[in-house]
UniProtKB/Swiss-Prot annotation:
Cellular component terms (Gene Ontology): membrane; viral envelope; virion membrane
TM annotation in the entry: 2-22
Domain of life: Viruses
Keyword Transmembrane helix: yes
Keywords: Membrane, Transmembrane, Transmembrane helix, Viral envelope protein, Viral penetration into host cytoplasm, Virion, Virus entry into host cell
GO biological process, one term: symbiont entry into host cell
Family affiliation: Belongs to the orthopoxvirus OPG076 family.
Record topology, Virion surface segments: 23-35
Protein's name according to its UniProt entry: Entry-fusion complex protein OPG076
Coarse class of the protein's main subcellular location: virion
Membrane topology: Single-pass membrane protein
Species in which this protein is naturally found: Monkeypox virus
Triggers of expression: Expressed in the intermediate phase of the viral replicative cycle.
Quaternary assembly: Component of the entry fusion complex (EFC) composed of OPG053, OPG076, OPG086, OPG094, OPG095, OPG099, OPG107, OPG143, OPG104, OPG147 and OPG155. Except for OPG095 and OPG053, each of the EFC proteins is required for assembly or stability of the complex.
């Protein structure tokens, strides 16, 4: 059970890290496209 919890935490952390890394890139790309 502990392994499942650790795997879930790692998955959430990785997804949050990738989201926080890609969000500004996507927003700046959208801004450049609209400009």
């Amino acid at each position: 059970m502990l392994v499942v919890i650790m795997f879930f935490i790692a998955f959430v952390f990785c997804s949050w890290l990738s989201y926080s890394y890609l969000c500004p890139y996507i927003s700046t790309k959208e801004l450049n496209k609209s400009r």
